[in-house]
């Protein structure tokens, strides 16, 4: 059960990462996977979240949909969200702020890897941060309901 659940979460994170929601300004689109990843961490815990995230990154690498730079950025986001979860637990504060913190850390990692444009990257990421903050709680509620339904049916 645990192995299948982790694999399904990995696929959910990987597939949702392919969906881009356009922003108002060109270059400000964002991935649907951010609020989903926050919800996965909040509902299933850091261990299952980080394993599913690593598997999702490996899927992206093996399918050719991402490269090592993408994986470094993804892992920065995941570690930021995970650290926030470890500090605050699964509460409304976590769901609202962990995604933007993870995104900011991912942009900081890009800045250190590329050496340019931290302020512009953070500005471009702002709509996605707002979307993640606004929707992660709803995804968390959905995942909690699904998780409870699966546990009671076994």
What residues fall within each predicted segment?
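Loop-helix junctions at membrane interfaces
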Residues: 1-154
């Amino acid at each position: 059960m645990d192995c299948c659940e982790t694999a399904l979460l990995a696929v959910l994170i990987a597939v949702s990462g392919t969906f881009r929601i356009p922003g108002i300004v060109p270059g400000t689109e964002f991935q649907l996977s951010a609020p989903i990843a926050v919800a996965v961490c909040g509902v299933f815990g850091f261990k299952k979240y980080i394993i599913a995230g690593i598997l999702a990154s490996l899927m992206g690498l093996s399918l050719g949909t991402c490269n090592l730079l993408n994986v470094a950025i993804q892992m920065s986001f995941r570690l930021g969200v995970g650290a926030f979860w470890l500090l605050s637990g699964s509460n409304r504060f976590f769901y609202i702020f962990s995604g933007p913190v993870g995104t900011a850390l991912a942009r900081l990692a890009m800045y250190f890897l590329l050496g340019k444009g931290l302020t512009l990257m953070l500005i471009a990421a702002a709509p996605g941060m707002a979307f993640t903050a606004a929707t992660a709680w709803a995804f968390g509620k959905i995942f909690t309901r699904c998780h409870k339904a699966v546990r009671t049916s076994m």
